[in-house]
């Protein structure tokens, strides 16, 4: 049996994805009821962060601790990863001492190379191309508030970035329609779009994408690693703010999500996070529960191989 990783959403089947989402809500109920559940005593998660993080780091670390295991935070600044030790060598060594590894980095090929030399499951905690863990939380949150997302319409407003790519995969796997509203030149890359013509439509207007949507999602205009483009992007994205007026074009029950951190006054209006249909705080909390369900799935799959 092959070693299972989670580098993009499509490393799971639709069936597995749905069962992880249901399990996430079940683990959430248990956690809220203060039930102790420690199936992974002695298991160690390694967390490699080449970019900053609040939610991803805390949710993974808290999650493995709640399961009875522990986590090691590894930054390139303090390890040999930052001094040029090859990914392949690092992967062999690091994975020989750990039970599961999470990586947040730049190029998606870095997590792929790490995974291909790893002896244990590898989770993508965000690359320049994908943020699949965030999608687990977003899908869980939609399901908890509105039921099945199948057949619904989701509007992605803003940059055709890593989050947008993961939304395209989710649309394909979960059976919803994705309307992407991006400024010219900032649409998702053609190589990602190519596969998803059946479920993704691109507009160069936020309004056209938002009409009748059941969920509106946005993200920062300049992602980590694009800080130098901030000023240029502020101009290009000026008419792509999610605000009360944009929400008014959508379905009355339309939810609002943002992976956070958010920039009030840029991609969202000052009060958007507090909009009556905003579920951003549940979305952030669900990172914990969704990733616990993911780690449980991967650790159990790996145990079956032994
Ligand atoms: N949404 C998200 O991944 O947040 P962090 O960058 O804080 O981990
Ligand atoms: N697109 C953003 C997401 C942050 C969680 C980034 O890559 O910086």
Swiss-Prot record:
InterPro entries listed in its UniProt record: Asp/Orn_carbamoyltranf_P-bd, Asp/Orn_carbamoylTrfase, Asp/Orn_carbamoylTrfase_sf, Asp_carbamoyltransf_Asp/Orn-bd, Orn/put_carbamltrans, OTCase_ArgI
Keyword Cell membrane: no
Protein's UniProt keywords contain Amino-acid biosynthesis: yes
Binding site for carbamoyl phosphate: 53-56, 80, 104, 131-134, 259-260, 287
GO BP field: arginine biosynthetic process via ornithine; citrulline biosynthetic process; L-arginine biosynthetic process
E.C. numbers: 2.1.3.3
Transmembrane region(s): none
Location in the cell: Cytoplasm
Top-level EC class: transferase
Pathway annotation: Amino-acid biosynthesis; L-arginine biosynthesis; L-arginine from L-ornithine and carbamoyl phosphate: step 1/3
Protein keywords: Amino-acid biosynthesis, Arginine biosynthesis, Cytoplasm, Transferase
Pfam families linked to this entry: OTCace, OTCace_N
Highest taxon, organism lineage: Bacteria
Catalytic activity field: carbamoyl phosphate + L-ornithine = L-citrulline + phosphate + H(+)
Binding positions (L-ornithine): 162, 219, 223-224
One GO MF term attached to the UniProt entry: ornithine carbamoyltransferase activity
GO cellular component term of the entry, any: cytoplasm
Function noted in UniProt: Reversibly catalyzes the transfer of the carbamoyl group from carbamoyl phosphate (CP) to the N(epsilon) atom of ornithine (ORN) to produce L-citrulline.
Family: Belongs to the aspartate/ornithine carbamoyltransferase superfamily. OTCase family.
PANTHER family: ORNITHINE CARBAMOYLTRANSFERASE, MITOCHONDRIAL, ORNITHINE TRANSCARBAMYLASE, MITOCHONDRIAL
Protein name: Ornithine carbamoyltransferase
């Amino acid at each position: 049996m092959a070693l299972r990783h989670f580098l993009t959403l499509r490393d799971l089947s639709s069936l597995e994805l749905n069962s992880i989402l249901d399990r996430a809500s079940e683990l959430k109920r248990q956690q809220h009821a203060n039930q102790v559940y420690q199936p992974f005593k002695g298991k160690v998660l390694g967390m490699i962060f080449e970019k900053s993080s609040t939610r991803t780091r805390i949710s993974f670390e808290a999650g493995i601790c709640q399961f009875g295991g522990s986590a090691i935070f590894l930054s390139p600044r303090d390890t040999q990863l930052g001094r040029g030790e090859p990914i392949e060598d690092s992967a062999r060594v690091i994975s020989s001492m750990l039970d599961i590894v999470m990586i947040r980095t730049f190029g998606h090929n870095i997590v792929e190379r790490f995974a291909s030399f790893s002896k244990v499951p590898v989770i993508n905690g965000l690359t320049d191309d994908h943020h699949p863990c965030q999608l687990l939380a977003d899908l869980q949150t939609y399901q908890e508030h509105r039921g099945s997302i199948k057949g619904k319409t989701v509007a992605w407003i803003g940059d055709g970035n890593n989050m947008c790519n993961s939304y395209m995969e989710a649309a394909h796997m979960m059976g919803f329609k994705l309307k992407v509203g991006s400024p010219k030149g900032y649409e998702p890359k053609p190589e990602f779009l190519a596969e998803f013509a059946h479920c993704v439509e691109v507009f160069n207007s936020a309004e056209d994408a938002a009409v009748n949507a059941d969920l509106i999602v946005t993200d920062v205009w300049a992602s980590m690693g694009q800080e130098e483009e901030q000023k240029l992007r502020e101009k290009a994205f000026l008419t792509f703010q999610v605000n009360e007026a944009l929400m008014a074009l959508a379905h009355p029950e339309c939810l609002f999500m943002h992976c956070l951190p958010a920039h009030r006054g840029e991609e969202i209006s000052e009060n958007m996070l507090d909009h009556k249909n905003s579920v951003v705080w549940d979305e952030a909390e669900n990172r914990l529960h969704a990733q616990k369900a993911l780690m449980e799935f991967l650790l159990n799959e790996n145990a079956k191989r032994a």
